[in-house]
Amino acid sequence: EKPLSLTLREAHEVYRRVEKAGKRLLPVYQNRYNPLVAHVKQLIDSGRLGRIHQFVCNVLWNRNDEYFQIDWHGTSEFDGGVLYTQASHYVDMLHYFFGEVESHKGEGGSLRGFEVFDSVSAVLRFRSGAVGTLNATVDVYEKNFATEFTLIAEKGTIRLSGTNLNQIDFW
């Protein structure tokens, strides 16, 4: 599953053990294999969209109190918070689209008093020039509200949405 670890130290240890065993270890980031995500990646890479102006990525989900009754959920030792447990798939998608992050600023907190953040907002600037926001929360009332990625470019705007980014709008 994902992510490989919650800290850089743990990641180095995992890497060391994998190398020693002569094995391969791959996290599961299935958005890269989503046909619509792959299509957007192709449009970006081909230059068809022109210069990327901005993106917005929203992961607005619900994880009710029952979810947090499971002993490791919401703990700093095992969970890592909304960026690790829910939004890491979308962080990976942003890396897939735009490459390495150049700079970032963010705010977050635990609105319900957990050891980890349950809501986060970040501004990300990528070396490729793409700039945008990532908003993630598990504090939406009653049920998941939206998973949405909007890309504003010189020659088009794209929105991926739906439960599994299975809807696309292009204009």
List each language-model region with its residue ranges:
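Short, well-ordered coil/turn segments that N-cap beta-strands
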Residues: 22-24, 53, 128-130
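Contiguous beta-strand/loop segments that form the cofactor/metal-binding neighborhood of enzyme cores
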Residues: 85, 91-167
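Predominantly a Rossmann-like dinucleotide-binding segment in NAD(P)-dependent oxidoreductases
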Residues: 31-113
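Beta-strand-loop-alpha-helix segment that lines the small-molecule cofactor/substrate pocket
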Residues: 1-32, 47
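A short beta-to-alpha transition loop/helix N-cap that caps and shapes the active-site region
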Residues: 7, 61-67, 142-143, 159-161
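Short, glycine/charged-enriched secondary-structure capping and boundary segments
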Residues: 12-15, 40-43, 68-72, 118-121, ...
